[in-house]
Amino acid sequence: MNDVDNPVSLSDLSTSRFAEIQEGDLRLKLHYNDCGSGAETVVMLHGSGPGASGWANFNRNVEPLVAAGYRVVLMDCPGWSKSDPIVCSGSRSELNASALKGLLDAIGLDKVHIIGNSMGGHSAVAFALANPSRVGKLILMGGGTGGPSQFVPMPTEGIKLLQGLYREPTIENLKKMMAVFVFDSSSLTEELYQARLDNMMSRRDHLENFVKSLAINPKQFTDYGPRLGEVTAPALVIWGRDDRFVPMDAGLRLIWGMPNAELHIFNRCGHWAQWEHADKFNRMVLGFLKQSEGSL
C-alpha cells in the first residue's frame, strides 16, 4: 500500500528522501519528502526561518493534497534542515531555484505546480522566470519578490527578530520571533517551540552560514518587480492582513505585475497562512489547482 492509498501513514520519517544534484557549478545533497503518487505534482518550498523545513512548514497541508490525488514533494532548501550547508553570496532566490531544477531533474519530474511560503515564494518566482515551461500553477504566500515596502520601513519588525534569532538562537528569542510570526500566538505550544529549537540547534552550521551569507550580501532576495510581467503561469497570491514579516503591499505588487494572478487576503492572519488558516487554505488551493484540470 502506498501513501496515496493510506494518507494517515504520511509522516516526515516515512516520506524522507535524499538526492544528489548537479546544476551548473552547484553540487549538493538535498533532502526532500515525497508523498503520494498522483499524475500531477505539487512542490512545496519553505521559508527562511531558523529551523525551517518542508515538513515543519507544510505538515498541515500535505494530506489533503495527497488525498485529492496529487503527488507532493517538499524540498528542504540548501542550508536548511537535512540538506547540505551552503554560504550564499548571491541571490538566495536563484540559488534555491537552481537547486529545485536539479532536484526535479534528479527525480524525473518535468512540469510541476509550486507552492512557496516567504523565501519559498521568492524562489518559486525565480524558478518560473528561469524555467517557464516547467511551471503549471503558482501559489505564493507572504513572498514572491524582494524589494522595499511602501507600507513600513525596512527591514520589518519580523525580519529584525528573525535575524536576531539566527545570531542568538535561544528559546527566548525564538518566542519573540514567533509572537509576531502569527496573528494569534496563543495557538503556539511549548511543544512547537521546543521542536523548532531542536531543529535549529541540530544544525548550528546552517545558522552560522546564514549569518555569514547576510554579511557578504545583505540583500539575499532579488527584487523581481521589473520582470513580474514575464511570469504568465496562473498564480494564486495569498497574504495575511497582519503579516509583520513581509507587508501586504508586496502581494499587491505581485498581482499588479503578474498578468494571470489573483490575490486573497486572510483577516486575522500573520506570515503563516497555510498553518494559521489551514482548512480554508487547503480548500482554496485545491479549488485553484482543479480549475481547468489537466494544465500539466
Curated annotation (Swiss-Prot):
Pathway(s) the chain acts in: Aromatic compound metabolism; 3-phenylpropanoate degradation
Keyword Hydrolase attached: yes
GO BP terms: 3-phenylpropionate catabolic process
Residues annotated as site: Transition state stabilizer: 118
Keyword Phosphoprotein: no
Catalytic activity, as annotated: (2Z,4E)-2-hydroxy-6-oxonona-2,4-dienedioate + H2O = (2Z)-2-hydroxypenta-2,4-dienoate + succinate + H(+); (2Z,4E,7E)-2-hydroxy-6-oxonona-2,4,7-trienedioate + H2O = (2Z)-2-hydroxypenta-2,4-dienoate + fumarate + H(+)
Annotated GO MF terms: 2-hydroxy-6-oxonona-2,4,7-trienedioate hydrolase activity; 2-hydroxy-6-oxonona-2,4-dienedioate hydrolase activity; protein homodimerization activity
Leading EC class: hydrolase
Superkingdom per UniProt: Bacteria
Pfam families referenced in this protein's UniProt entry, alphabetically: Abhydrolase_1 (PF00561)
Subunit and partners: Homodimer.
Described purpose of this protein according to its UniProt entry: Catalyzes the cleavage of the C5-C6 bond of 2-hydroxy-6-oxononadienedioate and 2-hydroxy-6-oxononatrienedioate, a dienol ring fission product of the bacterial meta-cleavage pathway for degradation of phenylpropionic acid.
Family recorded in the similarity comment: Belongs to the AB hydrolase superfamily. MhpC family.
Protein name, entry field: 2-hydroxy-6-oxononadienedioate/2-hydroxy-6-oxononatrienedioate hydrolase 2
Gene: mhpC2
